[in-house]
Structure formats: C-alpha cells, structure tokens
Amino acid sequence: MAKNSKYSDKQVDAVLHDMIAVLEKHQAPVELSLIVLGNMVTNLLASSVGTHQQAALAQAFSDALMNSVKK
C-alpha cells in the first residue's frame, strides 16, 4: 500500500504472507477478512497511538488505502 516505507519489501511480504495464511486457515471470506483487518487496525490505533494522533493516522491510512485501489 505504501510507496515509501522505512520497512523493506522482504519484511512487509513476510508479515503479509503470515496474515494471508491465517485468513486462509480459517477459510475467511472477503467480508470476514475485511472485518478482522479493520478491527486489527482499530486495535493498533487504540493500543499504540496517542489519542490525539489516532484520527489523523486513521485518515492517512484511509487515504493510502483509497489511493491503492484507484485505477
């Protein structure tokens, strides 16, 4: 999703592979997968980001997601 990142493609791909494997293990359809991933993002924001930064980071994430699906 991000074009510029401090993380290597190898790091991102490894985590992505593991997350896809979990969703496949549970035979999660697209809707359930999106619900789980959305809840994960919400949990990360709530547990790891200061309250005053949560909305801005959520908006930046949303914008990046929208940009990644635009054609």
Curated annotation (Swiss-Prot):
Entry protein name: UPF0352 protein Asuc_0778
SUPFAM superfamilies given in the database record: YejL-like
Gene3D superfamilies noted in UniProt: YejL-like
Organism: Actinobacillus succinogenes (strain ATCC 55618 / DSM 22257 / CCUG 43843 / 130Z)
Family: Belongs to the UPF0352 family.
InterPro entries documented for this protein: UPF0352, YejL_sf
The organism's place on the tree of life at top rank: Bacteria
